[in-house]
A protein has these predicted regions:
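Pyridoxal 5′-phosphate
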Residues: 1-205
């Protein structure tokens, strides 16, 4: 598919004043194609209702459509079960949920949380807050000149005091893509939980 054909699906680029525009802020939010806009309008016009809480026709329709999306995401991500797919408002809320509901109960004073020094605020601030709340230590994983996590140096940091590791797959700042499989395998050797911020990678990897 050609670039101009792809652009034709986005109303923003079809207006005369925007036909030559290039939108670079997709890491924050993307322009929406017409098919997405049409479906949102269709929802609000024809079956706007709460999901999973009512038995009326509208609610059943909304719930069915909602769960169908969950199934599609499961297939796209090759998840084992659709219950592994949890919808939130975005990556920032998701990471905060992990920090406060999963990591906080297992962390104590002087424990270590490892992150890369190239994280977006959404994958840095939650760990800074948690470290302050619990007395844990936040440490940065070493990176090389290509802004990639150095596996050999990372291995030297992994020990019984490290209780959690969090890193991005693809940086929305530099575009650097981590060797995420290697990092996960390395961290798992020490039975340490690891979280991957895959917000950028899911569309590009």
């Amino acid at each position: 598919m050609r670039i101009d054909e792809i652009r034709s699906h986005f109303p923003y680029f079809n207006s005369p004043q925007n036909k030559d525009s290039i939108y670079f802020d997709n890491a924050a939010t993307t322009q929406k194609p017409q098919v997405v806009i049409d479906e949102i309008v269709n929802y609000y016009q024809n079956y706007n209702s709460n999901i999973h809480r009512s038995m009326n026709k509208l609610a059943n329709k909304a719930t069915g459509e909602y769960e169908q999306v969950r199934d599609r995401v499961q297939s796209f991500m090759s998840a084992k079960k659709n219950s592994e797919i949890i919808f939130t408002s975005g990556a920032t809320e998701s990471i905060n949920m992990v920090a406060q509901s999963y990591v906080k109960p297992i962390i104590k004073e002087n424990d270590i949380i490892l992150v890369s020094p190239m994280e977006h605020h959404s994958n840095l601030v939650p760990w800074q807050i948690l470290a302050k709340e619990t007395g844990a230590k936040l440490q940065f994983m070493p990176i090389n000149e290509k802004l990639l996590i150095n596996p050999k140096k990372l291995q030297k940091l992994l020990n019984k005091h490290v209780k959690f590791v969090s890193t991005h797959h693809i940086s929305n700042v530099t575009g650097a893509e981590q060797n995420i499989k290697q990092i996960i395998q390395l961290v798992k050797q020490f039975n340490i939980p690891i979280m991957i911020d895959g917000a950028q990678a899911i569309a590009h990897s």
